[in-house]
C-alpha cells in the first residue's frame, strides 16, 4: 500500500495504490507470478500543457481550449507471468489487463525467450510485445464549434485508442573475475517500436488526410551491470 500526492498553487493531487502478489513454484523449472493492483487518484489530473483545436464546419481552426479531465480516476489491473527453463533455454511469457473508470481498457502480451551460448557467459534474448488500448470516454482529437465545449475533453493521444508492437533483440556478455567468480555484464539491446492510432471521424474537408500517422521508433541501448 502506497500513498502519494502534491499541492501547488491551489491545485492538488492525491493517490493511493495497493498491490497484492503471489509467486508460486509450479515445477522444478517453472515459476508463476500473479499480481492484482488497484490505484485511485483524485484532484487535479489535467495536463496543463495540452490544448485541443476547435474546428468550424469547413474544417478550419476556429480556436483552442485547454483540456479538462475528470477529477477522479480508479484503475484496476491483473498481471500474470510464467517463467520456465530447460538447460540453456529459458523464456518468460506475461499478460496484463487494465481497466479504469475513464473507460480505458488495455491488454499487454510480452514474450522473452533467452538462449545461453557457450561457456554460459553469453546469451541472446529476443523480445516481442503486443499492446492494445481503447480510448477514454472524453478523448477527442479536436472539437467542433457547432457542438460547443463538453464538460470533459482531452486531445492527449495517450488516452486515445491505438495498438502497438515492439520487436527487440539483446546480446549480453558476462565478464567473469576468476578469483572470486564474480562478474559484470556488458549488453547491447536494439528495439523497433510501431504505434498505430485509430483514425477518428473528420470533417469532409479533412478526409483523405492522415491526421494521426503511425509512430515509429528505433531504440539502441548499451548497458553495463556490475
Enumerate the predicted regions with their spans.
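Short loop/turn motifs that connect adjacent beta-strands in outer-membrane beta-barrel proteins
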Residues: 25-31, 85-88, 118-121, 175-185
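Outer-membrane beta-barrel "beta-signal"
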Residues: 169-171, 213-226
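Transmembrane beta-strands of outer-membrane beta-barrel pores
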Residues: 14, 38-44, 74-76, 84-88, ...
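Outer-membrane beta-barrel translocator/channel fold
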Residues: 1-25, 29, 42, 123-174, ...
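Surface-exposed loop/turn segments flanking beta-strands in extracellular/periplasmic regions
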Residues: 52-62, 145-153, 209-211
Amino acid at each position: 500500500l502506497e500513498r502519494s500526492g502534491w499541492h501547488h498553487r491551489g491545485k492538488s493531487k492525491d493517490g493511493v495504490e495497493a498491490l497484492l502478489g503471489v509467486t508460486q513454484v509450479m515445477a522444478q523449472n517453472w515459476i508463476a507470478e500473479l499480481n492484482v493492483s488497484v490505484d485511485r487518484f483524485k484532484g487535479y489530473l489535467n495536463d496543463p500543457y495540452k490544448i485541443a483545436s476547435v474546428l468550424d464546419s469547413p474544417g478550419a481552426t476556429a480556436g483552442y481550449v485547454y483540456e479538462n479531465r475528470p477529477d477522479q480516476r480508479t484503475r484496476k489491473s491483473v498481471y500474470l507471468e510464467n517463467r520456465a527453463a530447460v538447460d540453456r533455454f529459458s523464456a518468460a511469457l506475461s499478460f496484463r489487463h487494465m481497466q479504469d473508470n475513464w473507460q480505458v481498457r488495455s491488454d499487454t502480451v510480452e514474450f522473452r525467450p533467452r538462449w545461453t551460448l557457450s561457456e554460459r557467459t553469453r546469451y541472446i534474448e529476443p523480445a516481442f510485445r503486443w499492446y492494445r488500448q481503447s480510448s477514454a470516454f472524453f478523448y477527442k482529437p479536436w472539437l467542433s464549434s457547432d457542438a460547443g465545449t463538453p464538460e470533459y475533453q482531452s486531445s492527449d493521444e495517450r488516452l486515445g485508442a491505438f495498438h502497438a508492437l515492439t520487436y527487440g533483440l539483446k546480446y549480453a556478455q558476462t565478464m567473469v573475475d576468476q578469483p572470486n567468480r564474480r562478474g559484470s555484464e556488458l549488453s547491447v539491446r536494439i528495439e523497433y517500436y510501431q504505434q498505430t492510432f485509430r483514425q477518428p471521424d473528420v470533417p469532409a474537408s479533412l478526409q483523405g488526410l492522415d491526421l494521426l500517422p503511425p509512430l515509429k521508433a528505433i531504440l539502441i541501448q548499451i548497458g553495463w551491470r556490475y
